């Protein structure tokens, strides 16, 4: 059985995702397409526009994806290298022969060459990194700038190139394949048949219209309003105002210099105002959003994984007939979780936080089972 994995957030699943999956299926000769998907919060530290169960169902109902596996929150709300390492680990546990991903370059050889160049070990890179950090750039920005100094032919400032680079560095036994992104740029809200997830969400929030998505995703938008950070601001604001500084510094991603800034942001009238008040060149919006996730979840540093190349369980969220065959193929060798148990305790806490503004009892974690979507 030829299995190709895609690492995704599907926030929401759109026409570009459909194209990527169908192209990957054709070009890699896959019998089964498997998506490893972020849970209730995204890698950049945002509440997913819809819960993981709805997003997984929409992906499988589209016909492009056969099986959706959860990337646990502790591994998914992380910087790019950790996110990539954990996701690749799951793909390799599932014995996927190929990992396919979208990239701005569309050039797999360039990505592989960049990943294998050991740029980070060169004195020139280290000097450029030191200089960028001294100039006040965040560690991620400084790393990208230093990489560009040493290796100018590969643009490591582009979001999908960054992830592709880290997938290549994390891959052990899996082959890599890339599909060049179509249509709008990641941050481009312009209307096209293929729009970015950011553009789709922004357009929906502006005028209430859903564009550039398959019917399965359009149906999801009719179930309830899209979730975003402002829905969580009353709870988050309360926690920012009341958590002692010493407690806040015990949370993931928060140090002694960031904690006071977060507390001060608690006086702001909205999430966007709070985010703008805290963000600096050193503390990017993404880093602050991840810190806000840690505050909302009360995610302690000692609850963070100690390694990211070994995810302790594999949890299916949705699958069709082909996806079920893929699960049967590995059930004797992989720690599959289909019913609630202690391994999901943290994820249950995540979902309780996620559903606060929704008050949707259907989301309670221990009530959920993997969803079978008939292929007929």
Swiss-Prot record:
The keyword RNA-binding applies. ATP binds at residues 7-20, 102, 160, 181. It comes from the Bacteria. GO terms for biological process: tRNA modification. Keywords: ATP-binding, Cytoplasm, Ligase, Nucleotide-binding, RNA-binding, tRNA processing, tRNA-binding. GO terms for cellular component: cytoplasm. GO terms for molecular function: ATP binding; ligase activity, forming carbon-nitrogen bonds; tRNA binding. It catalyses: cytidine(34) in elongator tRNA(Met) + acetate + ATP = N(4)-acetylcytidine(34) in elongator tRNA(Met) + AMP + diphosphate. Its main location: cytoplasm. It holds the Pfam family HIGH_NTase1. Its EC number is 6.3.4.-. It is found in: Cytoplasm. It is an enzyme of class 6 (ligase). Gene3D superfamilies: HUPs (3.40.50.620). Catalyzes the formation of N(4)-acetylcytidine (ac(4)C) at the wobble position of elongator tRNA(Met), using acetate and ATP as substrates. First activates an acetate ion to form acetyladenylate (Ac-AMP) and then transfers the acetyl group to tRNA to form ac(4)C34. HAMAP family: TmcAL. PANTHER family: TRNA(MET) CYTIDINE ACETATE LIGASE. Belongs to the TmcAL family. This is tRNA(Met) cytidine acetate ligase. It comes from Exiguobacterium sp. (strain ATCC BAA-1283 / AT1b). The gene is tmcAL.
């Amino acid at each position: 059985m030829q299995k190709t994995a895609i690492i995704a957030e599907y926030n929401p699943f759109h026409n570009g995702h459909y194209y990527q999956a169908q192209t990957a299926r054709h070009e890699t000769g896959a019998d089964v397409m498997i998506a490893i998907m972020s849970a209730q919060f995204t890698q950049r530290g945002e509440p997913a526009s819809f819960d993981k169960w709805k997003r997984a169902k929409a992906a499988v109902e589209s016909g492009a994806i056969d099986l959706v596996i959860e990337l646990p929150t502790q591994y998914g709300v992380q910087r790019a290298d950790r996110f990539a390492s954990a996701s690749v680990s799951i793909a390799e546990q599932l014995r996927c022969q190929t990992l396919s991903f979208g990239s701005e370059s569309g050039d797999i050889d360039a990505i592989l060459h960049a990943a294998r160049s050991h740029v980070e070990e060169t004195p020139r890179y280290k000097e450029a990194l030191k200089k960028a950090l001294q100039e006040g750039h965040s560690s991620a920005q400084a790393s990208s700038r230093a990489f560009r100094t040493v290796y100018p032919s590969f643009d490591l400032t582009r979001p999908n190139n960054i992830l592709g680079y880290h997938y290549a560095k994390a891959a052990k036994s899996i082959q890599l394949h890339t599909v060049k992104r179509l249509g709008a740029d990641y941050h481009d809200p312009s209307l096209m048949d293929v729009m970015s997830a950011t553009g789709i969400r922004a357009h929906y929030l502006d005028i209430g219209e859903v564009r550039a998505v398959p019917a399965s995703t359009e149906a999801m938008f009719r179930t309830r309003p899209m979730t975003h950070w402002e829905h969580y601001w009353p709870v988050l604001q309360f926690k920012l105002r009341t958590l002692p500084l010493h407690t806040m510094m015990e949370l993931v991603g928060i140090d002694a210099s960031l904690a006071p800034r977060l507390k001060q942001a608690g006086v702001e009238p909205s999430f966007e105002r709070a985010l703008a008040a805290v963000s600096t060149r050193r503390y990017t919006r993404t880093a602050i959003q991840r810190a806000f996730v840690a505050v909302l979840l009360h995610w302690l540093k000692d609850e963070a994984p100690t390694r990211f190349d070994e995810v302790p369980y594999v949890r299916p969220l949705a699958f069709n007939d082909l996806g079920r065959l893929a699960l049967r193929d590995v059930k004797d060798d992989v720690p599959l979780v289909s019913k609630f148990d202690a391994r999901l305790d943290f994820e249950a806490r995540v979902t309780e936080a996620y559903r606060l503004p929704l008050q949707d009892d259907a989301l309670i974690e221990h009530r959920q089972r993997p969803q079978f979507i008939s292929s007929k």
